[in-house]
């Protein structure tokens, strides 16, 4: 065996040692020591391969790529993303929300202790100037800090910005380390469950407007969950960690979740079995009757409050015409520590998962490639929006500002919100576009036509569907009062023509549209629009 082959094997073995230490959450000093050994071996391998060592000044080449979990977007990709952002923004503004902006990094103490087990995913920055800072993990905690710091008593706000997480990236399915979130939140004292139901209504409007396909919004209540844990016998100090385990039921089978509860978190097996009886329940408003029929559970004041809230929610959901999109799912836990009331999560339904995507492995875990990276082909898109009520987060910051005493009318501002994962939505939209081919198809031509119209200063929209129904597009024109349509079909693609159709007025002889050359499309439209 050559020296290079030996070094490669040593690097591979040492990499396994480092990964195992990290998985075991070993002491940082022990991990750092083994990382030094790994880096030393890698330097030896570079030198043996005829490359300069990593610290050598003679190094003339470097890896020209973006960091893991990030990516560049082309102009064409950005046109699709901009459409997604504008669609989401228009729904937010329609509901009366105003936009704000917050720093991309916060004081570390602002973010610490708000995310449960996910706190390990926060990016910490090196100390510069005496302040310990971290990149924001989400937009919710900075918003709560903003409300507390500025003494705001009520606001309906939205924010579209990047957040950062040290996650295992799976970029083809929308899991990244740098990504956009679109948040909509309502802060203030209002009648119970009205803002909560509106947030779910906003989610339905956004997802239907973006045409992501079939989806369901799972809902649950943290007070009901906490009551389940209490009556099942979960110790107070384990409730949040057990809640985080339950939150994995959308990815793992019950047997694996139970194993985590008992073997990793030290929960008694009989307690875990009791939890399992509850968290596998799901349905709609009829599930409330089942819960009311459980005397042990309903003896808890938390359960009574949670059931009363959910009863109100279903009443308002019916009025908002969103009942068909909602599923009451007792396994939904949302691992973040700041939730206090209703919680919800929008997911694609099973029939909407592309058949080309691999399903999770038998254990529910994702395959790991050699080198410790997640095999992206084993990852599905997952949730595309999530949120809930967080009534105590603003008060936590207000109390800290007053030295631990929360006083004043704005000290504890109730809040509820929803956050949309743009990268995952973008993955869905892009997955519906066929793979690029040498021969232009109708979808690609539609994208090019839309781009040409925008470049010419003509407002335009197009459907994201690969095979859209013509009548549904006509209906959209009627509903949104769009006066003109550019039509393309297989014949038009082949001949290099388009059809221009007046959608506002029926013109005799032009019922099916007027055929013009692609090269004349802009001038013809400008003439007809009087531009």
Question: What does each model-identified segment do?
Answer:
Residues 217-228:
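Glycine-rich, mobile lid/loop segments that gate access to catalytic sites or pores
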Residues 1-8:
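Short, charge/polar-rich alpha-helical segments
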Residues 4, 59-60, 479-484:
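Accessory terminal regions of nucleic-acid processing enzymes
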Residues 80-95, 106-109, 139-151, 155, ...:
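Positively charged, Gly/Ser-enriched RNA/tRNA-binding surfaces
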Residues 8-80, 126, 235, 251, ...:
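Auxiliary tRNA-acceptor-end handling modules of aminoacyl-tRNA synthetases
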Residues 208, 227, 233-237:
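Retroelement reverse transcriptase polymerase core
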Residues 47-144, 149, 177-180, 192, ...:
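TRNA-binding/sensing appendages of the translation machinery
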Residues 120-128, 233-262, 348-352:
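Acidic, His- and aromatic-enriched active-site or binding-groove loops in soluble protein domains
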């Amino acid at each position: 065996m050559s020296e290079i082959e030996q070094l490669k094997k040593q690097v591979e073995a040492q990499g396994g040692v480092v990964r195992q230490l990290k998985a075991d959450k070993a002491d940082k000093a022990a991990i750092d020591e083994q990382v030094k050994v790994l880096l030393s071996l890698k330097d030896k391998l570079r030198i043996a391969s005829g490359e300069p060592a990593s610290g050598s000044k003679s190094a003339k080449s470097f890896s020209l790529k973006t960091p893991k979990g990030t990516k560049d977007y082309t102009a064409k990709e950005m046109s699709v993303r901009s459409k997604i952002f504008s669609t989401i923004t228009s729904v937010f503004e329609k509901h009366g929300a105003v936009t704000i902006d917050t720093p991309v990094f916060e004081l570390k103490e602002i973010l610490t202790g708000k995310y449960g087990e996910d706190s390990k995913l926060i990016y910490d920055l090196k100390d510069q100037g005496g302040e310990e800072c971290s990149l924001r993990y989400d937009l919710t905690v900075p918003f709560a800090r903003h409300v507390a710091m500025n003494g705001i008593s009520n606001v309906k706000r939205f924010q579209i910005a990047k957040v950062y997480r040290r996650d295992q990236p799976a970029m083809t399915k929308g899991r990244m380390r740098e990504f956009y979130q679109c948040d909509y939140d309502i802060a203030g004292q209002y009648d119970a469950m009205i803002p909560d139901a509106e947030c779910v209504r906003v989610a339905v409007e956004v997802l239907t407007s973006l045409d992501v396909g079939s989806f369901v919004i799972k809902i649950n209540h943290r007070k009901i969950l906490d009551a389940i844990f209490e009556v099942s016998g979960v110790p107070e100090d384990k409730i949040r960690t057990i809640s985080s385990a339950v939150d994995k039921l959308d990815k793992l089978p019950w047997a694996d979740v139970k194993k985590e509860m008992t073997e990793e978190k030290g929960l008694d097996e009989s307690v875990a079995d009791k939890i399992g009886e509850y968290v596998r329940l799901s349905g709609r408003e009829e599930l409330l009757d089942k819960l009311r029929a459980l005397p042990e559970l309903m003896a808890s004041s938390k359960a009574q409050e949670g059931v009363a809230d959910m009863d109100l929610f279903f009443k308002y959901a019916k009025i908002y015409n969103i009942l068909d999109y909602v599923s009451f799912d007792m396994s939904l836990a949302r691992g973040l520590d700041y939730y206090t009331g209703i919680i919800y999560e929008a997911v694609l339904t099973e029939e909407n998962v592309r058949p080309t995507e691999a399903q999770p492995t038998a254990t529910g875990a994702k395959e790991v490639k050699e080198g410790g990276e997640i095999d992206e082909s084993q990852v599905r898109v997952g949730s595309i929006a999530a949120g809930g009520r967080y009534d105590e987060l603003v008060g936590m910051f207000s109390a800290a500002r007053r030295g631990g005493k929360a006083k004043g009318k704005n000290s504890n501002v109730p809040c509820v919100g929803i956050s949309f994962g743009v990268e995952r939505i973008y993955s869905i939209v892009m997955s519906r576009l066929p793979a690029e081919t040498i021969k232009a198809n109708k979808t690609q031509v539609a994208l090019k036509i839309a781009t040409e119209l925008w470049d010419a200063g003509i407002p335009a929209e197009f459907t994201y569907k690969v095979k859209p129904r013509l009548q549904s597009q006509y209906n959209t024109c009627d509903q949104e009062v769009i006066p003109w349509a550019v039509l393309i079909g297989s014949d038009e693609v082949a001949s290099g023509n388009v059809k221009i159709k007046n959608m506002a007025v029926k013109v005799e002889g032009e019922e099916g549209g007027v055929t013009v050359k692609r090269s004349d499309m802009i001038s013809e439209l400008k003439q007809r629009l009087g531009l």
